A protein has these predicted regions:
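...captures the hydrophobic TM-helix bundle architecture rather than a specific catalytic motif
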Residues: 1-235
Length: 235
């Protein structure tokens, strides 16, 4: 399932990249999906993660934050998007259902990230948030919105490749995709997990829009205000 979702996401990104003639987005999406497919065929069937989900006090705290903040943004978006649509040119299609669908899918993917003990599950949630962010930032389809959406997707795909490198490191060095087992191994033998942790840190920096990747989040402010609020709060 995770591999199928990854392929579908890459296909959507490549379609937009071809449509808007953005080579970097297409190349990075291609690299990511090829790396994912090779990883799946080489290792995934031989690596079992007994517990796909993991609950602790920190994950429950994050659930509360996502639920409260995310729900508040969605409620605010109801009125905002009604006014937004009213200011659209006469006869313009009402795309609010797609907007709210993307918001809800984004929040759902965040829950997957928070609760996943399986690194592949987390990676899938990670990719879903990347695609949703791209579509939300480019919602208005203006030239500026499209340019900023591609800036986001390029930086986030680079981070996704960093996450993929971490998965490869885990498969080759520690032989597990379980976060719990990974942490135990890291405590007992830090050298085995150093490269994977470094790759995960790079992925986190890009997703959180930390320097020098902060420009994609600033570009999100061209989107409707609920999008900007959602992305700023989630990072």
């Amino acid at each position: 399932i995770c591999t199928g979702i990854s392929v579908a996401i890459a296909a959507v990104i490549v379609w937009f990249a071809v449509r808007y003639k953005n080579l970097w987005a297409a190349v990075l999406a291609g690299v990511q999906v090829v790396g994912t497919l090779i990883l799946e065929f080489m290792f995934s069937h031989g690596i079992e993660v007994p517990y796909g989900l993991y609950f602790d006090s920190l994950s429950l705290l994050m659930t509360f934050i996502i639920g409260v903040v995310g729900s508040g943004i969605c409620i605010y978006a109801l009125g905002y998007m009604e006014d937004f649509q009213a200011h659209e040119p006469e006869g313009a299609p009402d795309r609010r259902p797609m907007f709210f669908a993307l918001m809800f899918v984004f929040l759902s993917a965040m829950y997957v990230i928070v609760f996943s003990n399986n690194m592949e599950w987390m990676f899938t949630g990670w990719e879903v948030t990347t695609l949703c962010s791209f579509l939300l930032i480019g919602y208005t389809r203006t030239e500026e919105a499209v340019a900023n959406a591609f800036r986001q997707i390029i930086m986030n795909l680079a981070g996704g490749i960093g996450f993929l490198v971490a998965l490869w490191c885990c498969a080759l060095t520690v032989g597990t995709f379980s976060f719990y087992e990974f942490l135990v191994i890291g405590q007992n033998n830090p050298a085995l997990t150093t490269l994977a942790v470094t790759a995960l840190a790079f992925a986190g920096i890009t997703k959180a829009a930390q320097m020098p990747f902060q420009t994609w989040l600033l570009g999100a402010m061209v989107a409707p205000t609920p999008t900007s609020a959602l992305l700023h709060s989630s990072t």
